[in-house]
Amino acid sequence: MKKIGIGLLTLPLAATTFATTPIPDVSPASEGQHVFINIPQQRLFIYTDGQLTKAYPVAVGKSMTQTTLGEHKIGVKAFNPTWHIPLSIQKERGDGVKSVPPGPKNPLGPVFVRLGDPKLGLGIHGTNTPASVPGIRSHGCVRMKSPDALEFATTITTGSPAYVIYQMASLNEDANKNLWLAAYRDPYNKKNLNTDALRKSIAAWAKANGKNINSKRIDAILKARTGTANCLTCAKGAKLTMPLKSLAWTNGSSVYSKPKFMPKPVPVQNDVLPAGSEIEVNADDFVPDKAASATFVPSNTPASDTQNHSRKPAGSTYTTTPIPENSEPTEVLF
């Protein structure tokens, strides 16, 4: 097998929909698919032809095992992967086990999608511990709830660009021309939040739209960093209305973030490994409870994905059932 709460009007972030999730200041490609993963926000975004189409909660690398920032590409996909345990973790375990087959004990969940150069050892994958998502707790991989991981894997195309970014704030205008600010904690201690640029962007927007914004409200949001979206201009009881537009605040601008013109990408066939292929990445060996083990069924490779270039062995079949929610642990071990 091949290895590979401060007195402000706030809006809680949605778990699985982009409808109420603050969006980052990014310039996605005008053509094709584009993935952005914002570490402080613990969210993954998919843009299609310059428009946001999906957003998911994710768990990312811990401060000691950080998810590599920068530009990557979506690589090979493996459904029902076998986890090939790295030598370092084999030594820690000391039980002679070298791999974990597909199933409820497999920390990769039902699917693994390579992220970037294989030498980085990174991937976007499911989990046997759904309670660990979102969070800052992986060995560097991007972890999704398994149903989300399956949807992601069948949506994204091999070769699509994927950027891991580090934005500690989101500044969005809603459909009612209200301005919303969210601030996030600094898990990697980057200390890269440019508050001067952020305040400049807010001030420029307020002037252009004839709004008054209380600077103390901004101060409170930036100090608390709750990760919730806070309205800077709303009357009491106002609700966020769609669609959202991100301001290009990282440059201190009041204009909207815009897609970056790119030529239409050359179609690339999805590269799908045979079911059960070994994947060697740093993951953690968490064993779910017996109920989860009894009800787990492997995932399938969707027949509707006509662009798949599958290396699936002849005669192999797949079935699908998500990992049950009752497998969530009370303590995350990775």
Please state what every model-predicted region is.
Residues 138-155:
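Short beta-strand-centered segments at strand-helix junctions
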Residues 170-177:
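Short, Lys/Arg- and Gly-enriched loop/turn segments at beta-strand edges
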Residues 21-132, 151-154, 160, 179-279:
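Gly/Pro-biased beta-strand-loop elements
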